Design a protein with these regions (language model features):
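Active-site helix of classical SDR
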Residues: 91, 125, 133
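Alpha-helical segment proximal to the catalytic Tyr-Lys
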Residues: 96-97, 138-142, 200
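Short C-terminal tail/terminal secondary-structure segment
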Residues: 114, 174, 192, 203-214
Length: 214
């Protein structure tokens, strides 16, 4: 496993250690997915370490809250750079480097279906990701590579919790009929399914793993 990370070296190294403790091999590669040279270097490192790439999961993302206002253009640009430009770069390298049986998985969001105020830049970026997934699945026709997206609802991660009050978090947790936030393991299980043999006939789809949130 090649673990790409933006800046949290300690967390990346801990993830690598956990993978190795479980009996597999792993490396960590620091990369900004908005930078073409970083994405190329990340794939090069994976190929150098393991000889091939079978599954690519693009989960890099930012989620700043900003209304649709001219004064928030910098926030919009930054969100698009990481979430959409980054997805374009990662998916393009995956398309050129994976062989038959490969799996490409991108992360979207179920917030697209709810259109909450303040989520404009984030929703715009993730709607673009879903478009890329469907187009790439068709561009890879005949190569036996699937391209799908997972669209979680609210997940109890640092990205989601940052900047929200306890009352806001509780309110969001009550939105799904299951009345809780998802855990990272909930979403990882869906990604694992798409990466595995049982999902060989699932292609160009967006799986909305959200507990009924949307």
């Amino acid at each position: 496993v090649a673990v790409g990370y933006a800046g949290n070296t300690a967390q990346a190294e801990a993830t690598v250690a956990a993978i190795r403790d479980a009996g597999s091999n792993a490396i960590a590669v620091r990369a900004d997915v908005a930078r073409p040279e970083d994405v190329a270097r990340m794939f090069d490192a994976a190929l150098a370490a393991f000889g091939r790439v079978d599954v690519v999961v693009n989960s890099a993302g930012v989620m700043p809250m900003a209304n649709i206002s001219a004064e928030n253009l910098e926030v919009f640009d930054r969100t698009i750079a990481t979430n959409l430009r980054g997805a374009f770069l990662v998916l393009s390298h995956a398309a050129s480097r994976l062989g038959a049986g490969g799996r490409i998985i991108a992360l979207s969001t179920s917030v697209i279906a709810r259109s909450f105020p303040g989520y404009g830049p984030y929703i715009a970026s993730k709607a673009g990701v879903e478009g890329l997934v469907r187009v790439l699945a068709n561009e890879l026709r005949g190569r036996d590579i699937t391209v799908n997206a997972v669209a979680p609802g609210p997940v109890a991660t640092e990205l989601f919790l940052e900047g929200k009050s306890p009352a806001q978090i509780e309110q969001m947790a009550k939105l799904p009929p299951l009345e809780r936030l998802a855990t990272p393991d909930d979403i990882a299980a869906v990604v694992s399914f798409l990466a595995g043999p049982d999902a060989g006939w699932v292609n160009a789809q967006v799986l909305r793993a959200n507990g009924g949130f949307a």
